[in-house]
């Protein structure tokens, strides 16, 4: 996990792409809790997200879990690989298993996210 990653308390990770957009996925801890991911309900490119609102759903052999948008903005790209290979979330949650890219409406919302260190400390067993 890179130190540039930021996190939410609902286990989404966020990477600032440096161009006004962010990449979002779920944390390694989240994928471990879910177990084998079998389906991702992908949003549509062009959909708007509202920070704190659900934007997607991940289904595993154990449970279905809503994903919450960490930022307000517009979905500009989805990871189409997940439609045929949802297991990428388990195999590579921080790279090949990314879920969406969002164009930020307000960069200041990134200040509300946790650092990698804070996330790990908050979720230490």
From Swiss-Prot:
Its cofactor is (R)-lipoate. The modification N6-lipoyllysine is found at residue 62. It comes from the Bacteria. The keyword Signal does not apply. CDD domains: GCS_H. Binds 1 lipoyl cofactor covalently. GO terms for biological process: glycine decarboxylation via glycine cleavage system. One of its GO terms (cellular component) is cytosol. It holds the Pfam family GCV_H. Keywords: Lipoyl. Residues 21-103 form the Lipoyl-binding domain. The glycine cleavage system catalyzes the degradation of glycine. The H protein shuttles the methylamine group of glycine from the P protein to the T protein. The glycine cleavage system is composed of four proteins: P, T, L and H. HAMAP family: GcvH. Belongs to the GcvH family. This is Glycine cleavage system H protein. It comes from Psychromonas ingrahamii (strain DSM 17664 / CCUG 51855 / 37).
């Amino acid at each position: 996990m890179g130190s540039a990653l930021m996190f939410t308390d609902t286990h989404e990770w966020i990477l600032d792409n440096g161009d006004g957009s962010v990449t979002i996925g779920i944390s390694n801890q989240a994928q471990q809790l879910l177990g084998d991911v079998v389906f991702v309900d992908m949003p549509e490119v062009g959909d708007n997200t509202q920070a704190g609102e659900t934007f997607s759903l991940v289904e595993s052999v154990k449970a279905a879990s809503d994903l919450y948008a960490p930022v307000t903005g517009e979905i500009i790209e989805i990871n189409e690989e997940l439609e045929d290979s949802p297991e990428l979330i388990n195999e590579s949650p921080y790279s090949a298993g990314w879920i969406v890219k969002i164009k930020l409406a307000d960069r200041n919302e990134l200040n509300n996210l946790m650092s990698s260190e804070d996330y790990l400390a908050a979720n230490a067993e």
